[in-house]
Every structure is written in C-alpha cells, then in structure tokens.
Amino acid sequence: RLGRYAKPFGLYKLRSMSRKYSGQNAIQIFTRMNRPDLVEEYRKHRKVRKDPRITAFGKFLRLTSLDELPQLINVLKGDMSLVGPRPILPDELEFYRGRGSLLHSVKPGMTGLWQVSGRNDLPFEKRVELELYYAQNWSFWLDVKILLKTIPAVFRKGSAH
C-alpha cells in the first residue's frame, strides 16, 4: 500500500481471502469464473458485495471489521494514523486523476470520511472524492467528528463486505 508521500509500506491485516487468490487481478479471476456481474461490480466499486474469494471466517472478520485491527501496529509504527484516507494500492492511483500528491499529503488512516459516509455502498469515484476532500480540509475537529461516527458505522449492517 502507499502511505504518506506515496511511500510504500506493509499493511497489517487479518487474511480474509482464500490464499489461492492472493496477489491475483480480481477482474481476471471473475472473468475466469464466468461472472460478468462481478466484473462490472468490481469496476464500479473496486470491491464486490458477495465476493466468492472470501472465506467463511473472512466474511465474519470483514463484517465485524476485525480484519482491520492489526493496522493498529501500522499506527504505532507511524505508517498510518487513526483517521485519514484509506491506504491505496499503487494501481488505484490512476483513479485520483493527477491528485495523488494531495491524497498522499496526509497519512492514511484506519478510519476516514469514506468509512463513515457509506463505505462499500458508495461507488469508488465517491470514495476518491471523499478521500481528497479529507486531505484538502483536514482539521483536528474533522478527525474528532469522524472518530465519533466510526463506531456506529462499524456496527451498521451491510456497510462492510
């Protein structure tokens, strides 16, 4: 993942996806599965609601957001903050249309404006918009507001997948 100043770092996370799909291109996997519906959903959201690559235990981890807890190690190491834009993969940088330097002007966070504004129910373009808004308008009080909204967002049914 890319951190502040686009510096790559290792993101700690509990494995929720079957190992056989690790590091493979999602669109190619869904195409091989003959699932054009998943290809379309992935192109729109960069995620899929009922992802067949996720294990049964992984579904539980994602629904409860427990897969994200190891990122506290990233926070303690200084790679991440509690609040900020989600750390992106290098191939996602193209979606920020030349505004990657703005995105990477702040540390990535465990939670952020995207998570408390609808999370996976929003198209990826909206995520980009929210992440850039945060980077441009960061303030202590915005972080407090996001932190206060995070707990109900985690428990909101269906927002994590």
Identify the residue ranges that each predicted region occupies.
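Conserved small/aromatic sequence motifs within transmembrane helices
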Residues: 1-161
